[in-house]
């Protein structure tokens, strides 16, 4: 799969299915399928234009390009208030989690879940397992999506994001034809 990702010859849906192939929990698989479908509809792994903008800002502020840091920035930039706290402690070589712990505890549940997921990429300690992500009351669908999308980003870097934002060839050709007809 790594070769196909480097060549951009697969879809984001294929990457997601590959990353989560070992999880058989029916509730998780159902939410994952919905997350994959949403990405296919939007042609983006970002929740919004604001999420994309905050992520790109974060990427421009760090020197490291380690995939785990890219995943952390992706997670932390998904929530505006969380991003504002992150910017205060973002350094050229990463995020200083200890400096933002108190501020994050004041944010809403979604921000806190994203913070915990990002810290897993930093420290490697899993504070929750995939079964916790299936609880719709504890983890909103958007947070579930972002956490799941962060996995291929953490494994394959910005190539996963580029694949996510790639438009299907049919759609590209249709836009080209529409542009020529207008001329």
Give the residues covered by each predicted segment:
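Non-Sec secretion/translocation targeting segments of pathogen effectors
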Residues: 178-183
């Amino acid at each position: 799969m790594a070769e196909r990702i480097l060549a951009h010859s697969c879809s984001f849906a294929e990457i997601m299915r590959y990353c989560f192939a070992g999880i058989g929990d029916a509730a998780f698989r159902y939410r994952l399928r919905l997350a994959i479908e949403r990405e296919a509809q939007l042609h983006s792994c970002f929740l919004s234009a604001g999420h994309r903008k905050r992520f790109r800002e974060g990427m421009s502020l760090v020197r490291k390009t380690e995939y785990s840091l890219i995943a952390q920035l992706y997670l932390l930039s998904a929530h505006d208030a969380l991003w504002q706290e992150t910017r205060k402690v973002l350094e050229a070589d990463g995020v200083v989690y200890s400096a933002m712990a108190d501020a994050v505890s004041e944010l809403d549940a979604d921000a806190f879940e994203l913070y915990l997921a990002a810290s897993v990429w930093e420290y490697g300690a899993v504070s929750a397992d995939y079964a916790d992500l299936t609880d719709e009351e504890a983890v909103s669908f958007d947070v579930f999506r972002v956490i799941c999308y962060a996995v291929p980003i953490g494994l394959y870097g910005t190539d996963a994001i580029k694949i996510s934002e790639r438009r299907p060839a049919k759609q590209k050709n249709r836009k080209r034809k529409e542009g020529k007809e207008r001329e």
